[in-house]
């Protein structure tokens, strides 16, 4: 069912409103298009229309569900506040949990290999994390404190707890999920100094956490898929391999310890290779054979390596829709 919101932008010229809408759409590579009476842009399966109503510009927002609707409300609020004109919405769910936030409880934590720990969470709406995005943001409250969760304020913006109540907010990949049973699994790469690593060492069953999403990319739709990444990318690579159609062709290359790389379930046409160290990632990307069409190359590792991979892929002639190179962490800290 389609959901709707509307807002006025009093005191803002139409051209300034259009510039703010373009700024809001830019991170999603969503171009504006002309529609009768105004301009529209498509984001996350929803639509935002800007039109001149009377003397003031107005927004009309539609989305396939409430989560996306209120995520758009938050994003548009940010863009138009930056333009000096907060939208006046016809509806704001003030005090509600932030859009896309579910509260779940820890069921179990177990070591699945020397370098990885698997956490199972349970929640009534776990099923929604099985589509529309591979990733989610894990919200961890400070140890020993009563959690304060992000909520919607009077302007439709998400307000996050600050100071001593600030949440740790790492991003993880859904490793497995059973929507009917109401649980999802994710894997933590165990490393010194990691906030989630420390949390997983001591957390007890029944502990409450926030899970926000889903988000990020989805399974590449191309017939030939190349996946390359380091330890931090292994959960996403494993998830993608498990969701690829049977006829998929290509290969996966992971820089990870041998003890941490099982024989991952995958289509018969997808080869799996282990790389020795992060220094082998870019050479593997340079050497891999990629067809001229119906292709997708997925790369995730340290931020600087991802930037180099992006340049390399562009030099090989791949377009934006044929590749992804993401920095999952930075040498100076987590991304």
Language model features: what each stretch is:
Residues 1-335:
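Extended, composition-driven regions rather than compact fold-specific motifs
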């Amino acid at each position: 069912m389609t959901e709707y919101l509307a807002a006025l932008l009093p005191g803002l010229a139409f051209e300034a409103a259009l510039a703010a809408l373009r700024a809001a759409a830019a991170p999603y590579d969503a171009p504006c298009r002309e529609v009768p009476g105004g301009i529209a842009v498509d984001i996350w399966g929803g639509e935002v229309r800007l039109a001149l109503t009377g003397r003031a510009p107005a927004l009309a927002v539609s989305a396939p569900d409430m989560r996306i609707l209120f995520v758009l409300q938050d994003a548009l609020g940010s863009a138009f506040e930056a333009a000096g004109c907060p939208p006046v919405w016809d509806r704001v769910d003030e005090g509600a949990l932030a859009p896309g936030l579910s509260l779940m409880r820890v069921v179990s934590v177990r070591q699945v290999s020397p370098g990885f720990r698997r956490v199972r969470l349970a929640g009534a709406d776990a099923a929604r994390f099985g589509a529309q995005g591979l990733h989610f943001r894990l919200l961890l409250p400070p140890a020993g404190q009563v959690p304060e969760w992000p909520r919607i304020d009077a302007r439709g913006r998400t307000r996050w707890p600050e100071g001593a109540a600030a949440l740790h907010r790492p991003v993880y990949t859904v490793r497995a999920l059973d929507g009917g049973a109401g649980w999802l699994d994710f894997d933590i790469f165990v490393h010194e100094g990691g906030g989630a690593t420390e949390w997983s060492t001591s957390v007890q069953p029944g502990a409450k956490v926030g899970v926000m999403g889903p988000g990020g990319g989805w399974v590449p739709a191309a017939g030939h898929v190349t996946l390359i990444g380091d330890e931090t990318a292994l959960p996403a690579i494993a998830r993608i391999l498990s969701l690829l159609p049977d006829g998929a062709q290509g290969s996966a290359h992971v820089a990870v310890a041998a003890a941490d790389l099982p024989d991952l379930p995958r289509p018969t046409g997808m080869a799996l290779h282990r790389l020795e160290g992060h220094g082998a990632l870019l050479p593997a990307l340079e050497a891999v054979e990629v067809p001229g069409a119906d292709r997708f190359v997925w790369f995730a590792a340290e931020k600087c390596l991802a930037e180099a991979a992006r340049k390399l892929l562009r030099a090989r002639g791949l377009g934006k829709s044929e590749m992804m190179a993401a920095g999952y962490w930075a040498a100076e800290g987590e991304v």
